UniProtKB/Swiss-Prot annotation:
This is Protein FdhE homolog. Necessary for formate dehydrogenase activity. Its main location: cytoplasm. It comes from Aquifex aeolicus (strain VF5). Keywords: Cytoplasm. The lineage of its organism: Bacteria, Pseudomonadati, Aquificota, Aquificia, Aquificales. GO terms for cellular component: cytosol.
Amino acid sequence: MWGGEMNIFKQKEREFALNRIPVLKEKFPESNQILNFLSHILEYHNSIISEISDLSISLDNQNIESRLGKGKPALKLSEYDFEPFLKYFYPLLNIVYEHGTPQMKERVEHLQSLEKKEILSLISSFLENGISDDMLRFFLISYLQPILYTFADKVKFEHERWFKNYCPVCGSKPSVSFIMDTEDWEGARFLRCSVCLTDWLYVRTKCVNCGNVEDDSLDYFISSELDYIEIQTCKKCNSYIKIIDLRKDGLAVPDLEDIASVSLDLWAQEQGFIKVERNFMGY
């Protein structure tokens, strides 16, 4: 099975993502403010995906196959020139300034004052080394996600050869996982990239952070009110990740469910666990 075959599912998922927001607001009333803000970001993402999907994006398939064969992510994004896509950064700033928090608005004003080469440098640095500034991380991933989503659409990989805990496309960590039935697998577990939203196959009973497979140190918690969301914790490395069961709720959108269920993150963190990777909203 090639990675590209999942994109029909993902494209439909992106189309229905906005329609999922009202449902999530009912399920998670405590997250309404977050979800209202998220709806504006999703509208921005969908418009960018729609526009960029019409462009001719060429990738070096030979280099991609070589990198994947060596266990490296298909794309070394820090080497890519994002200047042609920089025009999409400024609409994001306008959206955040209009709908974001006072702290976000202050950061928008700072980012608007930077020269283009400074913004490109921030993007390159983030893709090469990551970033510790939570607010800046939000802006950069919010901007990059729809662009890299279209890049990932061009990358093919064999799921059976990539049971790793980092993205086969961009190398980022997953922020959420989910279970679904496919033509090839029943009850298969997938990880979803925190940056480019690529999905890839992973062992169901294995810690995503450290690779632990010992049953006595892996626990699973399910809320009686949210039985389609499970939290997998690992006592060896004190990490956790959510598992969204699409067999119980076929309309669930894993990355959105993860953001909306921030109350579950707070519970897991109170128990002393650290998330494998935060979503782009920082939760």
